[in-house]
Amino acid sequence: MVRDSIVVKGNREGLNVIIDMNKFQNFDEMLEIFIHKLSIGKKFYKGSTIIITTQLKEFNEKQISKFEEVLFEDFLIKDCIFKDIRETKNKVFTGVYEGRTKFYRRTLRSGQVINYPGNIVIVGDVNPGSEVYAGGNVIVIGNLCGEVHAGASGNTKAIIAAFKLQPSILQIANIMTRSPEDGPKPSYPEVARIKDGIIIVEPYLPNKFV
């Protein structure tokens, strides 16, 4: 068994788990050791929230889904939050991983649609003609130029953030707006949220949304 490859620490709401993927040969080896390590105190994890910090670039969508399946079905946890080790160091877009989060590491092209009841994080661009629907937040580590709807289940606290925020249609809960066709295009990350019943767009300040 790989020593110190998985560190488990308790908190008020559940567990903080730090996984060093550099110490594993592959995902399957990591998952086997993870299950063995947590099985010792399995009964204590029911209904808790688990925060997993690791090198998310080492995971594909299928592996993230399998990981979530193990946590929710085998350990009966209430919530799972994935954090990238780089994000915790750089404080970029932290504070948005609240609740179940789905990661997509690809560019979304015209005609493609993503729909997920939790948060969506896209590492890539969202091209014109594509659509993104999330019950929670939508975060794009790239250019957002397609249609995007956060808080689709009515969550007015949801946010939409991107390195370049220029969607054709932007909607949070039941409030919709369109990006202006003219005007300067900011070179910094922006976040859209609801304030006083309207959608506002402002520079992304990490400490404000942590």
UniProtKB/Swiss-Prot annotation:
Pfam families: MinC_C (PF03775), MinC_N_1 (PF22642)
Keyword Cell division: yes
Gene3D superfamilies named among the record's database cross-references: 2.160.20.70
Tagged with keyword Cell division: yes
PANTHER family the UniProt entry points to: SEPTUM SITE-DETERMINING PROTEIN MINC
HAMAP family: MinC
Role, per record: Cell division inhibitor that blocks the formation of polar Z ring septums. Rapidly oscillates between the poles of the cell to destabilize FtsZ filaments that have formed before they mature into polar Z rings. Prevents FtsZ polymerization.
Complexes and interactors: Interacts with MinD and FtsZ.
NCBIfam families in alphabetical order: PRK00513.1-6 (NF001775)
Family designation: Belongs to the MinC family.
Name recorded for this polypeptide: Probable septum site-determining protein MinC
Organism: Clostridium novyi (strain NT)
Biological classification of the source: Bacteria, Bacillati, Bacillota, Clostridia, Eubacteriales
